[in-house]
Amino acid sequence: MRLSVRWVFFLGFFLCALMLAIAGYFQFVENLEPCPLCILSRVAVLAIGGVFLVAALHNPKSWGIKVYALLGFVVTLIGIGITGRHVWLQSLPADQVPACGPGLNFMLDNFPLTETLELVFRGSGECAEVQWSFLGLTIPGWTLVAFLFLGVISLWQMGRTGGGAGKLT
């Protein structure tokens, strides 16, 4: 049994939706406030999920599959960069952690976008704080694993041909 291209794009979308639901649970139920890098990670997940959903609904053929998969892969690389930086910040010794900076909303309101992004990627103390872990991985660690999986899905889709109308064969 072989999954159609459409179903694989839906699978990628549902993984992104699950990731955002888990992020919402942590924020609104467990009261874990997201740091600026967490928010950027969510934006990347939302973008990848959007690409996968549009691809699944469009059900492209041949080159269209490759275009959507390439777009998803590029956004996945951005997500890997964001979460990789976040994991690195969390692995720093306490004396090397950058000082806490202003919140993302404050930076967006008061600084140009380029300066805001530079400050966010430089990182701050709040981004280095480990608030939760499971099986030895923090939230950014699990997010990095998910981005890697989404990247594999994108690469796999690039190598496939034919869409099919949602068939499992």
Swiss-Prot record:
Coiled coil: none
Keyword field contains Cell membrane: yes
Domain of life: Bacteria
Disulfide bond annotation, renumbered to this chain: C35-C38, C100-C127
Cellular component, GO, one term: plasma membrane
Subcellular location: Cell inner membrane
Cytoplasmic face of the membrane: 1-8, 61-67, 161-169
Example of a GO biological process term: protein folding
Location (main, coarse): membrane
Annotated Gene3D superfamilies: DsbB-like (1.20.1550.10)
Transmembrane segments: 9-25, 44-60, 68-84, 142-160
Pfam families, per the entry: DsbB (PF02600)
Entry keywords, A to Z: Cell inner membrane, Cell membrane, Chaperone, Disulfide bond, Electron transport, Membrane, Oxidoreductase, Redox-active center, Transmembrane, Transmembrane helix, Transport
Presence of keyword Translocase: no
Membrane topology annotation: Multi-pass membrane protein
GO MF annotations in UniProt: electron transfer activity; protein-disulfide reductase activity
Periplasmic side: 26-43, 85-141
PANTHER family (alphabetical): DISULFIDE BOND FORMATION PROTEIN B (PTHR36570:SF3)
HAMAP family: DsbB
Purpose: Required for disulfide bond formation in some periplasmic proteins. Acts by oxidizing the DsbA protein.
Family: Belongs to the DsbB family.
Record-given protein name: Disulfide bond formation protein B
